[in-house]
A protein has these predicted regions:
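Terminal domain-start segments
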Residues: 1-26, 147-158, 175-179
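Beta-strand C-termini and the immediately following turn/loop, strongest in propeller blades
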Residues: 4, 42-47, 94-101
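Repeated scaffold domains used in trafficking and secretory/extracellular systems
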Residues: 24-33, 69-86
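His-enriched metal-coordination microenvironments in redox/metal-binding proteins
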Residues: 32, 44-51
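Repeat-blade elements of multi-bladed beta-propeller folds
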Residues: 34-42
Length: 186
């Protein structure tokens, strides 16, 4: 049984319960990270590109109503989800979405960026500077060099950007203004 606790209106309550019984969670290893009204938030046990898969389950029906990937790199430093009310009173969730494209911005430049802007609804956003790539002429990473080895220039690009989601009655995800970051996909 899960008991919801009160929290500030723009945050999830500070709780983490690992559920390892598929009968209780519906998915082995997912972690309950909080509740907001009738909505239960779950996080996957592992992630990529600085993000974690999360899902939202309607407590009233027990059905999953939404799933995506959010930037959750340091939960103690920053709350990954923000909550607000739309003018019509519906709850909005805000977070930094993590996606992986099917091309490399450093390698393919504006042709890749144009495809990704359309695919992810990023409008007329300027092309972001990408990190984590080996630049032409740069030496390869050699153990025991410090840091993370840079990826080849042709590695697909991962993007993080701010979105807001209206969950009910049907999920609707919209990019919102803010910084778009690009890195080499893991």
């Amino acid at each position: 049984m899960v008991t919801a606790i009160s929290s500030p209106p723009d945050q999830l309550p500070p709780c983490r319960i690992t559920i390892n019984d598929p009968g209780e969670s519906g998915e082995d290893g997912w972690v309950f990270i909080g509740a907001k009204g009738p909505l239960l938030f779950w996080e996957a046990p592992d992630g990529l590109n600085g993000g974690e898969d999360f899902r939202v389950v309607d407590l009233r029906t027990g059905k999953k109503i939404f799933e995506d990937t959010a930037l959750i790199w340091n939960r103690r430093a920053i709350q990954p989800f923000g909550f607000a009310s739309a003018p019509d009173g519906k709850m909005l969730i805000r977070y930094r979405r993590v996606v992986v494209g099917d091309c490399s911005i450093p390698k393919d430049g504006t042709s890749c960026w144009s495809k990704l802007k359309v695919r992810f609804g990023l409008g007329n956003a300027p092309i972001p500077k990408c990190t984590g790539y080996r630049q032409p002429g740069q030496k390869g990473w050699v153990f025991p060099d410090p840091g993370v080895p840079p990826e080849e220039i042709g590695t697909e690009s991962a993007l993080t950007y701010p979105v807001e989601v209206e969950l009910l009655p049907q999920p609707l995800t919209r990019p919102i203004p803010g910084l778009i970051r690009c890195s080499a996909a893991e």
